[in-house]
Amino acid sequence: MEALNSILTGYAVAALSVYALWFYFLSRRLTGPKVLPFVGSLPYLIANRSRIHDWIADNLRATGGTYQTCTMVIPFVAKAQGFYTVTCHPKNVEHILKTRFDNYPKGPMWRAAFHDLLGQGIFNSDGDTWLMQRKTAALEFTTRTLRQAMARWVNGTIKNRLWLILDRAVQNNKPVDLQDLFLRLTFDNICGLTFGKDPETLSLDLPDNPFSVAFDTATEATLKRLLYTGFLWRIQKAMGIGSEDKLKKSLEVVETYMNDAIDARKNSPSDDLLSRFLKKRDVNGNVLPTDVLQRIALNFVLAGRDTSSVALSWFFWLVMNNREVETKIVNELSMVLKETRGNDQEKWTEEPLEFDEADRLVYLKAALAETLRLYPSVPQDFKYVVDDDVLPDGTFVPRGSTVTYSIYSIGRMKTIWGEDCLEFRPERWLTADGERFETPKDGYKFVAFNAGPRTCLGKDLAYNQMKSVASAVLLRYRVFPVPGHRVEQKMSLTLFMKNGLRVYLQPRGEVLA
């Protein structure tokens, strides 16, 4: 028995010695945060979870814009599933999103995690499946009828609901959570635009709509899959426990709601996206089945709700802390409305801005772009590495590993945006005369709307929606943060405010000085 114990002890010592040597050489190659045996940099990531994006930015500053780390320091695993290359170098981002686009798909882990919610929809697919939907959607997003439909939904929601809620808050001197209101507004709008059915979550009593609640639950449960190993969430799914049980039940509600919407549009087509996809055929000439239509619609709902509402929330937070920017926005609004509606300021707030009026708001667009530079709605994205590759800065990325590009960090690098990169300065987006909006010459230093073949199709609609909502609030009210309210980032794929954005409102009164 002692001999057996001695042999086992010898094997264990030898294995640990080999592991220690392997770990030594691996850790010397890793340029990012410190890694520990077996668990890698995971403890430091967890310790910094409340400021995860700033922590990543700190590491990128210290390493010149790119670093590599492991979250599973185990032989034969560390070079693939647990290996991450993190970058904010614009040339690397261009390489990933454009030059070697096919080498950096969503990847199997991402597709598996989101499959139950998004199926093979445009935001959860690669290759030919993605390309077919992209081409179809691209045609629809260039039509004027879609722009008109969006304007109708946005302005109707502002006039008939948002203004009523804000007016009541002013009368009662009660605070409101702008983030919650914007989430409800954009959810109602994107549902109306996508399948012509308004869930009316933005109403005076701020109701809990079953579809909205189920959609939120399904989204949160799906995001948890990315925090677990595939094995763990699949076990939960098979056993029907934990977040997987919530996901299953919420998806049943979502699918019932979507089936009703699809049936309604089959019987009465309109100008929404679902009606347009109902006319499409697959590669074999067959109509798209109901489950495919469900997932196509849900993909657009997911993309169109959170991004604009989160951007608007951070916009108002920045404006409240930079009153000189607010003054310039209101002055620009007054100049445009004086030309389009005359000198009577009461007429300026009778109706929300038309999209044609919003198109003329150059400074407001610059302020929104500056918001997205500092607080991008999607702060980082992940890509799977199909084949070994070398990034433009010389970093080798092994196949099977993950590449993360930090959009949040790009906007906070002095080497990219200059010494004033942390300042909220909309003027950086304008031509020297201040007359025109100007995108950066290096397009990959601003990828808040993605870039390359996956550039956001709804970018222009998103800007117009945000300009309409921002102007609707700023023309009528002055906004002040609730004393003591803490604005913090939530650890999520979308840059939500953890505690919302609670504010008081005051009537603006005369706009012109």
Swiss-Prot record:
GO BP annotations, alphabetical order: fatty acid metabolic process; suberin biosynthetic process
Cofactor(s) it depends on: heme
GO molecular function: alkane 1-monooxygenase activity; heme binding; iron ion binding; long-chain fatty acid omega-hydroxylase activity
Bilayer-spanning residue ranges: 7-27
Induction comment from the UniProt entry of this chain: By abscisic acid (ABA), the ethylene precursor ACC, mannitol or cold treatment. Down-regulated by auxin and salicylic acid (SA).
Annotated binding of heme, by residue: 456
Record's protein name: Cytochrome P450 86A1
Organism annotation: Arabidopsis thaliana (Mouse-ear cress)
Record lineage: Eukaryota, Viridiplantae, Streptophyta, Embryophyta, Tracheophyta
